[in-house]
């Protein structure tokens, strides 16, 4: 486990280890990336045990291009076990690359909605998918896929992650500080806002990538964002960084 120490403001590892039999089921000789738990990473294990929606989304490239997969999981005494075999989301996947699915719980009360990235139209853009009324996307026999134009650019827009009404993603569009930058957009109940660069306190002339935003609760001033960057000062290559960002 990773815990946050309120006294010294540091994240620390505990000795409470968990086994992820789930990962033994999804990992292959191919590339697996973009993991996403449907219960949005609650802080404490007893919250996990109360979760009703236990799906694990990720991407893999068994056919050469990235496709989105899902595997159900259940809670064991000390970890997570698969509750079935992984399966591809064939209604979403194409001959191009699809990945980094993130559920959008605030979009509709009776139709499950998610966002993901794809380069089906030439460059990477962020797409929205909606399932049938009253059904999960993974249960639907048909889905509606759209590309929100307000989020799109002529560059590559990738790795969307939604927490509450905020989406964070990475893009090498104009208006950044160089390479891939982190951007955010806010959902107003009907549409996404025009993306805003997260600024030079987070972004650099290097690449900032794959942001994950975690709502921190009422006791905290900021939400937690974790991302990767190949900026100088790390251990080499891409390293993980965390930062507090204002709640929106």
Please provide the spans of the model-predicted regions.
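Short, conserved micro-motifs composed of acidic
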Residues: 1-248
């Amino acid at each position: 486990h990773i815990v946050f120490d309120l006294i010294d403001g540091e994240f620390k590892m505990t000795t409470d280890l968990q086994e992820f039999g789930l990962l033994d089921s999804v990992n292959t000789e191919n590339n697996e990336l973009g993991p996403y738990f449907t219960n949005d990473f609650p802080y404490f294990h007893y919250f996990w045990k109360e979760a009703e929606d236990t799906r694990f989304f990720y991407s893999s490239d068994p056919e050469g291009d990235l496709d989105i997969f899902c595997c159900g999981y259940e809670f064991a005494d000390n970890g997570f076990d698969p509750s079935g075999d992984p399966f591809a989301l064939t209604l979403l996947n194409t001959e191009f690359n699809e990945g980094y699915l993130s559920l959008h719980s605030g979009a509709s009360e009776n139709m499950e909605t998610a966002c993901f990235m794809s380069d089906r139209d030439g460059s990477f853009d962020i797409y929205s998918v909606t399932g049938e009324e009253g059904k999960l996307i993974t249960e639907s026999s048909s889905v509606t896929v759209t590309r929100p134009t307000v989020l799109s650019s002529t560059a590559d827009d990738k790795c969307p992650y939604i927490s509450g009404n905020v989406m964070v993603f990475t893009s090498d569009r104009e208006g950044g500080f160089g390479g891939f930058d982190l951007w955010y957009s806010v959902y107003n109940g009907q549409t996404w806002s025009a993306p805003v660069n997260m600024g030079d306190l987070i972004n650099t002339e290097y690449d900032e990538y794959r942001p994950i935003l975690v709502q921190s609760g009422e006791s905290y001033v900021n939400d937690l964002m974790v991302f990767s960057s190949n900026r100088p000062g790390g251990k080499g290559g891409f390293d993980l960084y965390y930062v507090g960002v204002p709640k929106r």
